[in-house]
């Protein structure tokens, strides 16, 4: 058979083919996939692009996650079939209204009948999508293969870069004008990978949540900015941000966050300020791995600091204040394994991994 495959990670180094059981085994000439929780229900949906010549039909596929291990193709109902030779695709909240929109690149140049060259789908309040007119994409008539989002001018509105076939690439600057607010979040792993790939971010405003998942590659030949974009509508404060670090299964929650800012959340350290980023290596602990259950503290400035050490479950195992350079930390009672040490002094915050043998 020629269906596409969904493999479930069993958590033990093996995978199980759940294509048929999940309803995701769609027989299309898949060119790219992208993930996004388009209906903000906490379950990630899958968008699959398709070629015009596919024997299984000409449309793209939007697999809505049913939250029970199955998916339903809702491309027709939502108006996102595209019905052309599709390549790259990306979800984005272009107008920061809290609803994810969708941009699709195509392999036709717009001169062949009704076949689209590209499409920007704007999500409506009822979960359907429309292609708005006269918003700047009228000249988006090139054969293109891939696209990605970022923020070239740091105004909180996602811009789109498009890789065209022969012609120069397109950079679509987002010039949306409205009163909506935004938040950008970048994850920095300590035990997890540094780029935060594979981890989930939830924000909540007045009981309504949005979710993002940092991908390693975005569809065909693309990589989005590692800053995840959230549109917050007219809200001026976010009740909480919750990060789930997949490598350890731990969660980290930050309450009462202002909008209209870009933040970095470092695993085990919370939000990093500009000072945090610039002084990220102001301390170390040695020898690492520990020698006879003792770490020594090395601080670039001879100032007093506070120390917290967490295990991989996120449990605080040691807390010490008023420490100075060359102070010793006894970890002889620790179980063998990896820990995270967090040092803070005034506005300086930094974290490192510790290995206890």
What are these regions (language model features)?
Residues 1, 46-51, 102-106, 159-164, ...:
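Hydrophobic beta-strand segments that make up the repeating blades of beta-propeller
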Residues 1-2, 53-58, 111-116, 167:
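Short, solvent-exposed loop/turn segments at conserved positions within beta-propeller repeat blades
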Residues 7-28, 59, 63-84, 110, ...:
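Blade-edge motifs of beta-propeller repeat domains
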Residues 8, 21, 30-40, 49, ...:
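Beta-propeller blade termini
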Residues 38, 94, 152, 233, ...:
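Hydrophobic loop/turn residues within beta-sheet-rich immunoglobulin-like superfamily modules
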Residues 49, 244-248, 342-346:
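Beta-strand-rich extracellular modules
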Residues 110-113, 128-279:
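Gly/Ser/Thr/Pro-enriched helix-cap/hinge segments flanking short amphipathic alpha-helices
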Residues 206-210, 277-357:
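C-terminal outer-membrane/trafficking sorting elements
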């Amino acid at each position: 058979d020629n269906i596409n495959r969904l493999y479930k990670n069993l958590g033990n180094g093996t995978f199980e083919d759940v294509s048929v059981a999940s309803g995701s085994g769609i027989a299309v000439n898949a060119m790219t996939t992208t993930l996004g929780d388009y209906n903000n229900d906490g379950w990630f949906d899958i968008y699959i692009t398709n070629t015009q010549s596919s024997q299984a039909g000409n449309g793209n596929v939007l697999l809505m996650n049913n939250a029970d291990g199955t998916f339903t193709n809702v491309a027709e109902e939502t108006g996102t079939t595209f019905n052309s030779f599709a390549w790259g695709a990306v979800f984005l909240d272009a107008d920061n209204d809290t609803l994810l929109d969708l941009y699709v690149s195509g392999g036709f140049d717009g001169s062949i009948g009704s076949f689209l060259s590209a499409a920007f789908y704007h999500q409506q309040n009822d979960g359907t999508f429309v292609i708005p007119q006269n918003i700047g994409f009228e000249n988006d008539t090139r054969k293109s293969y891939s696209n990605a989002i970022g923020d070239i001018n740091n105004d909180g509105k996602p811009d789109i870069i498009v890789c065209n076939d022969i012609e120069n690439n397109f950079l679509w600057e987002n010039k949306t004008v409205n009163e909506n607010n935004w938040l950008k979040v970048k994850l920095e792993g300590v035990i997890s990978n540094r780029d935060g790939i594979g981890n989930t971010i939830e924000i909540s405003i007045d009981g309504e949540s949005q979710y993002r998942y940092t991908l390693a590659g975005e569809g065909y030949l693309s990589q989005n900015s590692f800053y995840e974009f959230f549109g917050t509508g007219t809200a001026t404060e976010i009740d909480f941000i919750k990060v789930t670090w997949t490598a350890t299964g731990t969660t980290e929650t930050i309450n009462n966050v202002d909008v209209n800012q870009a933040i970095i959340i470092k695993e085990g350290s919370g939000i990093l300020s500009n000072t945090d980023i610039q002084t990220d290596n102001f301390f170390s602990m040695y020898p690492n791995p520990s020698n006879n259950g003792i770490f020594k503290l090395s601080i670039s400035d001879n100032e007093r600091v506070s120390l917290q050490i967490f295990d991989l479950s996120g449990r605080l195992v040691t807390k010490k204040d008023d420490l100075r350079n060359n102070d010793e930390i006894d970890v002889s009672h620790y179980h063998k394994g990896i820990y995270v040490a967090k040092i803070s002094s005034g506005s300086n915050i930094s974290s490192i991994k510790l290995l206890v043998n």
